């Protein structure tokens, strides 16, 4: 991209890619307008037409919102095919409001290649999982799934729309999200939404 509007087109391309990764379907034109600070939907349509002409996106004429970022488009964004998204921050202490923004991308570990497209990473904040070897500042690799077996470590969304990393247990009439820290109490919930199962761990700095 070399024309004056190239940066804006890349911004739009990035927003489309991140939105699809986050919620599995593309944004509306008005959502794109808001995200990239454009007031005119016709301007966005023009940028989308140019992105399609360059081969960065594919559109389905029969489905107005069907937009797919192509491999060429991912290359323009610097995203390798085996990269996985790092999504916001999730607590491993007291739950915090879940953040669903994609911060960056991380190379997929070779032993998890079969899970490509179903994985995301979250940075852990807190010490509630230290007995399981998950420390403050670690990145957990999570397989997207909506259920888990008792004893598995999951990323769960509580009824207050907060995300947390805990060991999952389904009890009689309630759910228990158990920390791996002897000084902390479990979280007891009548309803819990599982975002995924922790399948790996990445630590950038080791003391």
UniProtKB/Swiss-Prot annotation:
GO terms for biological process: DNA repair; DNA replication; negative regulation of DNA-templated transcription; proteolysis; SOS response. Signal peptide: none annotated. It catalyses: Hydrolysis of Ala-|-Gly bond in repressor LexA. Its EC number is 3.4.21.88. Residues 29-49 bind DNA. Keywords: Autocatalytic cleavage, DNA damage, DNA repair, DNA replication, DNA-binding, Hydrolase, Repressor, SOS response, Transcription, Transcription regulation. It comes from the Bacteria. The keyword Transmembrane does not apply. Represses a number of genes involved in the response to DNA damage (SOS response), including recA and lexA. In the presence of single-stranded DNA, RecA interacts with LexA causing an autocatalytic cleavage which disrupts the DNA-binding part of LexA, leading to derepression of the SOS regulon and eventually DNA repair. Belongs to the peptidase S24 family. This is LexA repressor. It comes from Lactobacillus johnsonii (strain CNCM I-12250 / La1 / NCC 533). The gene is lexA.
